[in-house]
């Protein structure tokens, strides 16, 4: 029997977002065994249950109040939202925050040997897709009529199979399109993973746990986007060195034993430190430059 006092989080069982979701939960300190085939896994150190389901089931589970939170791609979430609105429903949920993984784009693609003069080239054409509502919204806004061919997989083979004139599908590198004689011609939606919460009253203990989880997620994302930098820098050029690190907090400056001309600098930078920046630092007289990853961070 389900314990309603435990926080329920839905995540993709397998696929594009599964590994990243699992890593995020682990880095937030949630100890859970997700290596078994069980669809419900219980955290060892927190009152949290993880439901491992198909990604297109997650928005509905949250909107219907079956689970408290869901980790889902914005593309899947928006498609389900449009689908429910088309059926006269008023789906409710909260987006707690966008996450730093799961980036993709939903694009139109046509055979490479066909001319492309913009979206109007699709007027009256048949388009295969797994995202009929996102596609319809985009083309309706441009006043383009089309016929939709709904496919739940292998969308890219539709033109060769004679099922459609073009496709609308998720694209990462474009290699799959190229292998099927297609080219990406228009991006209609850009997506990342996000964390969503069900609407309605939440028990105080659950809300406190959600707030704690959000703080940890923020710390994980900040740590990924930040680097800890250490170096020796000439005293007379400190301002120039600091100016090369936009987004950095004010550095900690320590004296070097037996050296009055240089100091040791420690700082956290919120931007990626590229080789070009390191070379400029060296040109200013900095030495022993170390750039280290940060595992956890809390402001």
Curated annotation (Swiss-Prot):
Pathway: Amino-acid biosynthesis; L-histidine biosynthesis; L-histidine from 5-phospho-alpha-D-ribose 1-diphosphate: step 1/9. It is found in: Cytoplasm. It catalyses: 1-(5-phospho-beta-D-ribosyl)-ATP + diphosphate = 5-phospho-alpha-D-ribose 1-diphosphate + ATP. GO terms for molecular function: ATP binding; ATP phosphoribosyltransferase activity; magnesium ion binding. Its EC number is 2.4.2.17. One of its GO terms (biological process) is L-histidine biosynthetic process. The keyword Manganese does not apply. This is ATP phosphoribosyltransferase.
């Amino acid at each position: 029997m389900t314990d309603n006092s435990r926080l329920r989080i839905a995540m993709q069982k397998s696929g594009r977002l599964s590994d990243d979701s699992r890593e995020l939960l682990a880095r937030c300190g949630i100890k859970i065994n997700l290596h078994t085939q069980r669809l419900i896994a219980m955290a060892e150190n927190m009152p949290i249950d993880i439901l491992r389901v198909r990604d297109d089931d997650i928005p509905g589970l949250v909107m219907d109040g079956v689970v408290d939170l869901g980790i889902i791609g914005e593309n899947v979430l928006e498609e389900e939202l449009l689908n429910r609105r088309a059926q006269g429903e008023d789906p409710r949920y909260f987006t707690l925050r966008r996450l730093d993984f799961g980036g993709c784009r939903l694009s139109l693609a046509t055979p490479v040997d066909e001319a492309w003069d913009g979206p109007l080239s699709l007027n009256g054409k048949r388009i295969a897709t797994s995202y009929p509502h996102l596609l319809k919204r985009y083309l309706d806004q441009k006043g383009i009529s089309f016929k939709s061919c709904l496919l739940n997989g292998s969308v890219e083979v539709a033109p060769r199979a004679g099922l459609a004139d073009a496709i609308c599908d998720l694209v990462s590198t474009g290699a799959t399109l190229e292998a099927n004689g297609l080219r990406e011609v228009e991006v209609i939606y850009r997506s990342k993973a996000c964390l969503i919460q069900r609407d309605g009253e939440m028990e105080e203990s659950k809300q406190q746990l959600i707030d704690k989880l959000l703080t940890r997620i923020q710390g994980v994302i900040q740590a990924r986007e930040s680097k800890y930098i250490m170096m020796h820098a000439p005293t007379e050029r400190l301002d120039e060195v600091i100016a090369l690190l936009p987004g950095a907090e004010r550095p900690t400056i320590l004296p070097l034993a037996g050296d009055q001309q240089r100091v040791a600098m420690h700082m956290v930078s919120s931007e990626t430190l590229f080789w070009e920046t390191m070379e400029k630092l060296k040109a200013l007289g900095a030495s022993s430059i170390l750039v280290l990853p940060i595992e956890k961070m809390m402001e």
